[in-house]
């Protein structure tokens, strides 16, 4: 009876994680890919659009406020403080998105940029809480499934703020599009308020020295430097491409409606499918076995950019290219995020997850910010050729990764 109740509670918690992941995906694109379309229509060039990736630099430093967030979240240890933090961070994100719509990116450049940075700050807090929710609510053996659910919820959010926002922008202004996205986050906020959160185990409340304890606990792990290097390099290909595929598809003649349906909507479905398959693979195979294969598959998918650039640019070839790119991206993501959880200790979950994801975000910000320069000065052909080889550094590190 207890076992059945525990299993049912796990299912409810996994569904809860799926639904609260949705605003994370919604907000993610509002400072990234969707923003690039708004900036493009406002007259910004590829270099400037690429540099806007720097607004997400705040994610690099989230490990600094991780201990404070952990302290607040676990007072009291019955999950009430954790729920308050979820509510506050998501509500702040919604308000920031709404305020952002009051600025014009060309005439209010500074205010617009500052609002984006503040949005990225609260988004980073929400992301930390979201990722740690799996460790706090879900049994270890179900982390692969919960990560697939988290990724799927996140991707559905991206689908809405990607495909949905792009399609809406052909009907209404970008300011109205962003207001719509803010409103769509409200149901998840209400779910967080009314859902009866319960941790799978009692969390001890520690002092502010817990950052050093969390850091020391992490560096005691075998081959921790290899883990750090792997986190930094694993998504190098996607980080190098950044938002440039948006510009590429527009440059070779596709319309926003083509991209809303073919690239964003269909591509997101392919990513979700790949994410679920990747999550189930985590239950069957060892992580290094999965990483070796999915990295190569995803690298090969970059060749489709070159084929589109050199040959046919039909709707059919767009769908084929997008499926191969996004499905393999989904395959790479679930095992990676699940592995991140395995590298953390439950008692330091927020701080250590913040530390690991901060390391991963260095690559996102650094290579995303130079992608515009690379695409402009190398040309699309060389740009995508280089992207297809970006998997090599992470692939070399796989053989040295510790088993977790």
Swiss-Prot record:
Keyword Plastid: no
Keywords noted in UniProt: Cell inner membrane, Cell membrane, Membrane, Transmembrane, Transmembrane helix, Transport
Presence of the UniProt keyword Membrane in the record: yes
Entries under SUPFAM superfamilies matching the protein: MFS general substrate transporter
Any one GO MF annotation of this record: transmembrane transporter activity
Cellular component aspect of the GO annotation: plasma membrane
Family annotation (InterPro entries): AmpG_permease/AT-1 (IPR004752), MFS (IPR011701), MFS_trans_sf (IPR036259)
Topology in membrane: Multi-pass membrane protein
Pfam family name, one: MFS_1
Membrane spanning residue stretches: 11-31, 49-69, 84-104, 109-129, 154-174, 177-197, 224-244, 261-281, 294-311, 315-337, 353-373, 378-398
Compartments it resides in: Cell inner membrane
Coiled-coil positions: none
Family under the similarity heading: Belongs to the major facilitator superfamily.
Protein name per the record: Putative transporter AmpG 2
Species of provenance: Rickettsia bellii (strain RML369-C)
């Amino acid at each position: 009876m207890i076992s059945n109740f525990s299993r049912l509670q796990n299912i409810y918690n996994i569904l809860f994680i799926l639904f609260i992941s949705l605003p994370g995906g919604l907000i993610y694109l509002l400072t990234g890919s969707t923003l690039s379309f708004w900036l493009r229509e406002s007259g910004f060039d590829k270099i400037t659009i690429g540099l806007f990736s720097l607004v997400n630099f705040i994610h690099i430093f989230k490990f600094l406020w991780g201990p404070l967030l952990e302290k607040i979240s676990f007072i009291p240890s019955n999950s009430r403080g954790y729920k308050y933090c979820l509510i506050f961070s998501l509500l702040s994100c919604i308000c920031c998105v709404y305020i952002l719509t009051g600025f014009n990116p060309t005439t209010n450049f500074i205010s617009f940029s500052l609002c984006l940075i503040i949005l990225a700050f609260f988004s980073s807090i929400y992301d930390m809480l979201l990722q740690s929710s799996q460790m706090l609510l879900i049994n270890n053996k179900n982390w692969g499934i919960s990560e697939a659910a988290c990724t799927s919820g996140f991707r559905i959010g991206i689908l809405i703020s990607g495909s949905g926002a792009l399609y809406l922008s052909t009907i209404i202004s970008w300011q109205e599009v962003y207001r719509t996205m803010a409103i769509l986050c409200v149901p998840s906020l209400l779910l967080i308020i009314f859902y009866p959160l319960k941790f799978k185990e009692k969390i001890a409340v520690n002092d502010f020295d817990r950052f050093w304890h969390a850091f020391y606990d992490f560096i005691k792990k075998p081959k921790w430097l290899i883990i750090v290097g792997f986190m930094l390099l694993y998504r190098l290909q996607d980080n190098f491409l950044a938002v440039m595929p948006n510009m590429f598809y527009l440059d070779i003649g596709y319309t926003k409606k083509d991209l809303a349906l073919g690239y964003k909507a269909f591509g997101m479905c392919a990513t979700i499918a790949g994410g679920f398959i990747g999550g189930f693979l985590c239950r069957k195979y060892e992580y290094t076995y999965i990483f070796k294969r999915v990295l190569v598959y995803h690298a090969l998918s970059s060749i489709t950019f070159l084929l589109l650039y050199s040959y046919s640019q039909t709707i059919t070839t767009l769908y084929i290219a997008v499926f191969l790119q996004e499905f393999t991206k989904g395959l790479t993501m679930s095992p990676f995020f699940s592995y991140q959880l395995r590298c953390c200790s439950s008692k330091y979950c927020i701080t250590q997850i913040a530390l690991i994801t901060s390391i991963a975000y260095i690559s996102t910000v650094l290579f995303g910010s130079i992608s515009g320069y690379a695409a402009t000065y190398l040309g699309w052909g060389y740009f995508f050729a280089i992207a297809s080889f970006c998997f090599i550094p992470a692939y070399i590190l796989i053989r040295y990764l510790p088993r977790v």
